[in-house]
Amino acid sequence: MAVRTAERVSREVSDNFVFQRSRLAYVEAAGRIAGRVLEIGTGTGYGVDIIAPHAEHFTTIDKTRSDELPPMPANVEFCEAKVPSLPFEDDTFDYVVSFQVIEHIKQDRAFVAEVLRVLRKGGKFIVSTPNRPMSLTRNPWHVREYTAEELGALLSGFIHVERLGVEGNERVWEYYEKNRASVHRIMRFDVLRMQWWLPRWLLQLPYDVMNRLNRRRLHRSNRVLTEAIEMDDYRLVEVHDRCFDLFYVATK
């Protein structure tokens, strides 16, 4: 069995629950952006064709270039770079977008400071990240996860922050509850609660293996439900504790 890392959002059908939710962030951002746009965290590039038509120029960066990256439209430039430092001049971009990335970054305050630096006055930072109260277990690929209050505090250097979240309908919740029960069956063997105190690097491979086995098993036993979830089963609302993701729009 090929094991796909949980570091990046996957288009594998067993990951449909997460993939459709992640697509929503791009679609919502596309209706808000214009001008020069920077994306931090290209991943496999599934958001490029969503954002690019709405931008005058779209720069997308990641620490490595994914083999799954699609051909780039004429107004798109891929840049290989590591954060928190950004290889751009001050006041370069009208919008910065970053989805499911900030939880992976050790120096999150330095990262936000760099976003502020490269944004023009009045520019906006659109960011999404998992809502910690909804996580079923520790993800060792994440340095940390945020509550709504914690993400708001991290973005306190902006003049205004619109605090939204992603919630799902009954179909989404049915899948979530089945997943929660499955994860609980696996984690009952962690009697020493090692997931909470072992180093992240030591947990990453076991997590990837068990996460992939769990999602594929859920798909086999709930094929119709897993494949039926669509982006429209999610929506943006004012943030609350039972949102799956946080989606904040911060204005410089």
Question: What spans do the regions from the language model cover?
Answer:
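Conserved N-terminal segment of class I S-adenosyl-L-methionine
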Residues: 1-89, 95-99, 109-112, 148, ...
